[in-house]
Amino acid sequence: MAAARGAWCVPCLASIETLQELCRKEMLICTNIGITRKNLNNYEVEYLCDYRIEKGVEKFFVKWKGWPESCNTWEPTRNLKCPTLLKQFYSDLYNYFCALKPNKKGFLKNSIKSLDPSLSDYIVKKAKQRIALRRWEEELNRKKTHSGTLFVENTVDLEGPPMDFYYINDYKASPGVNTLGEAIVGCDCSDCFKGKCCPTEAGVLFAYNEHRQIKIPPGRPIYECNSRCKCGPDCPNRVVQKGPPYSLCIFRTDNGRGWGVKTLQKIKKNSFVMEYVGEVITSEEAERRGQQYDSRGITYLFDLDYEADEFTVDAARYGNVSHFVNHSCDPNLQVFNVFIDNLDVRLPRIALFSTRNIKAGEELTFDYQMKGSGDFSTDSIDMSPAKKRVRIACKCGAATCRGYLN
C-alpha cells in the first residue's frame, strides 16, 4: 500500500531518512519530518569518491545521500560541511599508502594533485564497505535481545558483512528436532541462593556464587531456575538466560583468521560471556554438512554430547555473536552445559564463561576441541568423523598451540 501524489508513490513503511530524501527529490515541504523551506535544498554528503587540485583549489568528488552516482559532483572544500568524512577520507589515503610502502610514514597531503584510478576505486569501495558494516551493526542490535551492545569493525581489508548469515538469539530447530521443551515444575523459593532449589532437585551443585560467577568445575552441568519458578528476574540462579551483559565488537583480524570478537569492557574471571547458538540438527545431518564444510575449511559444528550424541549445533548460517569467536589453544572462555526450560539431557544449552580476568579490547576465544566436560575430545566442535580426514591449521599463536584445530 502507498499514499499517492500524482504518479509519485511513498511506501507506507519507510524510515524518516527515506521520507526526507523523497521530499527533497520532489521539492516537498513537510515540517513533521523536519523538511522546511530553509533546508529543503540542503544536500548531505554520503561519502567522498575522489580528489584533485584544480587551479590551486582542492576539490572532492561527492556522492550525495539519496541520489544516484550519476549525480556525483566535484565540490571545493569550502562547500563541504562534513569534517568527519573528510578526516575519514584522509585516513583511508594514509592507510592505503602505508600498506603499499610499510617503511614509509604515509604521504604528504599537499604533494597529491590527483588520485590514481585504482586509489579512487579503493576509496569508494572502503566508503561503501563502511556503510554496509554500519547497517549490519544496526541490524545486529535490532535483532539481539540481550543488554550488551554489538559493534562491527574492519580496519584490515575490504571484507563486508557475511552474505549468508542470519542472527538468532536461541536455538533454531531443524525439522524433526524439538528444542522448546517446557519445564514441568519450578521452585517456590524466597531465596534461591540459600535454597539451592533447582540444582538440588536435579541432583547437582548450585553453579554460582553471590556475584553470579561460576563456581563449579568444568564438566558439571548448570541448572538454572525456569519459567515455572516463582522467583523473579533478579534471582541469582538466572544468569545465562538473561543473555550477554557485555558490549562486544566483531572485528576483522589481521593474521588471516577472518572475523573475531573482542570485549569492549573488562570481564571478571568466571563470568558468563555468551551462549553458543545455531541450528540444532541430527548427528546424521551433521555428518553430511561436515563434509561440505570440510572442503571450505570452516568450523561451526558443535556436538551436544553431554550424555548422548544425537544432536549437533550448526552455527554456519544461523547464530549469534559466538559465530565469530575464534579458536585458541590457550583460550579465555570455557564451555558449560546449561539446562533451563528444556531439561532434555540430549539438548543442553552451551554457555561460555571467562577462565580469567579479561581486559577491555582483548579478543575472546575458546578451544574448539574442548567439551562441556572440560576434557579434550574429538567429539566437540567441528569434529564429526567426516572432519577427521582433513586437518585444519591453527593460527592462534599461543605458546601452547597444538598446530591444528582438529
Curated annotation (Swiss-Prot):
One of its GO terms (cellular component) is chromosome, centromeric region. Residues 390-406 form the Post-SET domain. GO terms for biological process: cell differentiation; embryonic body morphogenesis; gastrulation with mouth forming second; methylation. Residues 43-101 form the Chromo domain. Zn(2+) 3 binds at C192, C225, C231, C235. The gene is suv39h2. Belongs to the class V-like SAM-binding methyltransferase superfamily. Histone-lysine methyltransferase family. Suvar3-9 subfamily. Although the SET domain contains the active site of enzymatic activity, both pre-SET and post-SET domains are required for methyltransferase activity. The SET domain also participates in stable binding to heterochromatin. In the pre-SET domain, Cys residues bind 3 zinc ions that are arranged in a triangular cluster; some of these Cys residues contribute to the binding of two zinc ions within the cluster. Zn(2+) 4 binds at C329, C394, C396, C401. Histone methyltransferase that specifically trimethylates 'Lys-9' of histone H3 using monomethylated H3 'Lys-9' as substrate. H3 'Lys-9' trimethylation represents a specific tag for epigenetic transcriptional repression by recruiting HP1 (CBX1, CBX3 and/or CBX5) proteins to methylated histones. Mainly functions in heterochromatin regions, thereby playing a central role in the establishment of constitutive heterochromatin at pericentric and telomere regions. H3 'Lys-9' trimethylation is also required to direct DNA methylation at pericentric repeats. Zn(2+) 1 binds at C187, C189, C192, C197, C198. Keywords: Cell cycle, Centromere, Chromatin regulator, Chromosome, Differentiation, Metal-binding, Methyltransferase, Nucleus, Repressor, S-adenosyl-L-methionine, Transcription, Transcription regulation, Transferase, Zinc. SUPFAM superfamilies: Chromo domain-like, SET domain. The lineage of its organism: Eukaryota, Metazoa, Chordata, Craniata, Vertebrata. It is an enzyme of class 2 (transferase). Residues 185-243 form the Pre-SET domain. It is found in: Nucleus; Chromosome, Centromere. Its EC number is 2.1.1.355. S-adenosyl-L-methionine binds at R257, G258, W259, Y300, N326, H327. Residues 246-369 form the SET domain. This is Histone-lysine N-methyltransferase SUV39H2. It catalyses: L-lysyl(9)-[histone H3] + 3 S-adenosyl-L-methionine = N(6),N(6),N(6)-trimethyl-L-lysyl(9)-[histone H3] + 3 S-adenosyl-L-homocysteine + 3 H(+). CDD domains: CD_SUV39H1_like (cd18639), SET_SUV39H2 (cd10532).
